[in-house]
Amino acid sequence: GELLSNYYHSRFGVDTRSVRFPGIISNVTLPGGGTTDYAVEIYYEAVKGNKFVCNIAPDVYMDMMYMPDALRATVDLMEADPAKLKHRNSFNIAAMSFTPEIIREVVERHVPGFQMEYNVDPVKDQISRSWPNSLDDTCAREEWGWKPEWDLESMTKDMLEKVAAKLK
């Protein structure tokens, strides 16, 4: 699809734009067992007062993004000045990169006594280790001013509040 976007832009002048998202974290959608879903499930278990069993190794970095940033990035790209866009097939966008151990530490600051243990799934481990530690979003930053608004700390605070309200 990305090369087709380039072709239609160069051949017919079609204004095509797209993004490559990292793992998306949302308080709206329940975790469904995907490789990045541990980063959503941890908040649900923390709010419930449960010990969280993480199936990703503690040292694996993965790029993540909070849903509000993902939505804003999409709108910002669609509203960007086409004259400033050099790329047409797809833009990498990034927000934060962390390990399960890093997110555990942040959650524990907000939920004292939170506990997490590891039971690494070999298939998910292999998948997660095959991904890049971080995405290079230089083109998005330079061509249309992409900049995330949420970091791990602010996302954690918001996720815990919204998940708690949802579970009431």
For the regions a language model picked out, list residue spans one by one.
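A conserved pocket-lining segment of Rossmann-fold NAD(P)-dependent short-chain dehydrogenase/reductase
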Residues: S18-G32, E41-M65
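Short, hinge-like loop/turn segments at secondary-structure boundaries
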Residues: G34-D37, S134-L135
